[in-house]
């Protein structure tokens, strides 16, 4: 009928799941937001209520008021503290990642992940993963997962060795 009505709703003020405005920019808030996507279905371009790697980061950082570009390769070059990992050995990359804050983005060609931290000197990330290689064949995953960076690409190198940059957006 073309009439717009204004409607008020009552939201509990002490509900920890509700925040007025953006959440404070902290590693904990980034990780809490990311973990809400754990096991969500992978879908290229975020089709049909799914998330791909870049939409995961886009959605997580949006909760703290940072609007990232939509695509992983563009997110890699967005303003912030960017650490170049190219040309580093695996051990050097682990040292650099150990100096990064949880919630930093980890970029490699055509993929981006959210850094969680290290366990026994092994870096871990949460990311929306379509597949990886194991025992010489493609392993379908198709969901948001937590993994170390020992996962293999089709060329036989690990995700750790494919990393190009660690990015802390500001």
Language-model features: where?
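N-terminal capping segments
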Residues: 1-87, 109, 126
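Aromatic- and glycine-rich peptidoglycan recognition patches
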Residues: 4-5, 9, 19-20, 115-170
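Generic detector of well-ordered alpha-helical segments enriched in charged/polar residues
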Residues: 31-35, 83, 94-97, 160-164
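Acidic-enriched, low-complexity/disordered segments with a strong bias for Aspartate over Glutamate
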Residues: 49-52, 73-74, 91, 121, ...
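...with weaker cross-activation on analogous glycine-rich loops/strands in unrelated enzymes
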Residues: 69-136
């Amino acid at each position: 009928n073309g009439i717009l009505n204004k409607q008020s709703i009552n939201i509990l003020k002490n509900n920890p799941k509700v925040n007025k405005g953006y959440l404070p920019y902290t590693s904990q808030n980034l990780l809490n937001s990311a973990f809400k996507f754990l096991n969500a279905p992978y879908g290229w371009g975020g089709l049909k209520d799914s998330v791909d790697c870049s939409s995961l980061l886009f959605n997580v950082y949006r909760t703290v008021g940072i609007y990232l570009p939509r695509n992983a390769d563009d997110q890699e070059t967005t303003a912030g503290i960017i650490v170049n990992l190219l040309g580093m050995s695996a051990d050097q990359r682990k040292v650099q990642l150990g100096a990064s804050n949880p919630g930093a983005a980890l970029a490699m060609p055509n993929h981006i992940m959210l850094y969680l931290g290290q366990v026994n000197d092994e870096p871990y990330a949460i990311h929306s993963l379509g597949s990886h290689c194991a025992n010489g064949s493609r392993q379908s995953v198709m969901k948001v997962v937590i993994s170390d960076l020992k996962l293999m690409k089709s060329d036989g190198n690990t995700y750790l060795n494919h990393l190009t940059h660690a990015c802390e957006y500001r």
